[in-house]
Amino acid sequence: MVAYRFLTLISLGLGSHCVSALQYGYNQLSTHKDPAVVAGAFPAINGTHLRSPAFTSPGTVSRGFSDGTSGPTRDETMEGFMRRLARSNSWMAYHEAGFKSEEGRKFPYMYLSASSSSVENPSSRKLRVWLQGGVHGNEPAGDQSMLVLLGDLAANQKWAAKLLEKMDILVLPRYNPDGVFYFQRYLATNFDPNRDHLKLARQQTRDIKELFAKFSPHIATDMHEFTAGRAFGPKKDFIYAADALFSAAKNLNIDEGIRQLSEKLFAKRMGKDIEAAGLRWDPYITLGESSSSKLLLREAGTDAKIGRNAMGLSQCVVFLCETRGIGIADQHFERRTLSGLVMAKSVLQTAVDNFDEVYNTIERGIRRFTNSRNDIVLTDKSPIIERTFGMLNTTDASLFDYPIDFATTTPAEPVLTRSRPRAYLIPPSWPDIVKRLEVFGVKADKLPYSYVGPVEALNVTSVTFDKEFYEGVVTTTVETKLVERSIRLPPGSYLVKTNQKNAALAFVALEPENIDSFASFGIIPVNTGDQYPIFRLK
């Protein structure tokens, strides 16, 4: 098995508890529960009543949960809970996806609607909301918060009815059932499911993305957990104080109006709702490398291989919602799950309370993006600013604001841009590229005639290989020069028009300079001096 050291070293989710080499199954992290002094800073919240199997049926909790070798809720327990809710509530429909995990496990999901709509035939003038958890199998508060949300909706019929007046909701609690079974971050094949959204290496990724594209949501959330015990400072005696870290989608090819809606309405409301629940939050970050002695934290990035940005590039509002939980087994599980629940409910309530603004802004953003002739962004940078970040002293549990350098992506700054093509031309010898685009929800027309005429071509001027493996490949940084030429392509070539909602996913995949492009991952291999085999129409 490949040791994905580059991935594990930079990942906040794994942090200092990373697995340095992988085997088949049970790639579990060591458990380091909070000592008593730290645990005292994360007490149970008075009045909390969570309606999901881990809390209402404690006898169903797996024995390994207490020592960090399993999650709390088995597949069959989760499925039974969901089925019972669906039988008792006409507006809840239990479904099993028409595909299986890599080891043959099911994907149950709930479709919530006050009408007779479906994934294939959604309600008109309603928001479509996609909620998912369990992408990483060792982050149990992610899927549990989705189950608690379902339980809350069933117990609060008036609130559910108010939501469903304005939206249809699809809840996929467990994105990675094999990872949950092994209590590991990865898929069964040891690919990271949250790094496969562009290259689409695994069929499971493709299947779920096709369901997502079919539903075509206006709003989505992705529920995760982050490492609890990552220590900082000269004495390694302080840790993140937050219960919750969150981030909107940041890629600059998402319509600016949609990004502004995410930051100025949803993010502000989410922070207030977390505080109102007696919890603490900060923006989602990863640890950066700095030449100075000052701690550098990087705000959630713009890379499209991450689910948050990949979903956002379909022109929707997306939030990554992370709770403090990796590495501490069952400790503070009620508080962790509550943190996820508060964030998910905040997104739903904000959308309903501001329905006209939210619906109209997203729909206008989709139209504006679809008809835009503005340049597209291929690479960007994160300006460094000074700010503070909430920390907790592990010796006395005191809370304090620690000064840091902060690489911000709110917003990122464009570095390399290029004119937006009217369409891409793909030769018939690349049907696998077209299939990937179709998984994204991008439409491609197969031409019954030869194409003869002018195109924009990209001549490769530089290819630089990374120094390490990344999920089994050596990624590349590609530079090109745009030239004009005439070309003859045979019948069966593909025309991918860019006046479509999901075209931004084609931009990041097909423009070679993008960090997550098909060229970067070797799906379309290129070398210096080559002419890139995908062509642009002005």
From Swiss-Prot:
GO terms for biological process: proteolysis. Residues 53-76 are annotated as: Disordered. Residues 1-21 form the signal peptide. It is an enzyme of class 3 (hydrolase). Its main location: secreted. Its EC number is 3.4.17.-. GO terms for cellular component: extracellular region. Its cofactor is Zn(2+). The active site is at E322 (proton donor/acceptor). Belongs to the peptidase M14 family. Extracellular metalloprotease that contributes to pathogenicity. This is Carboxypeptidase 2. The gene is MCPB.
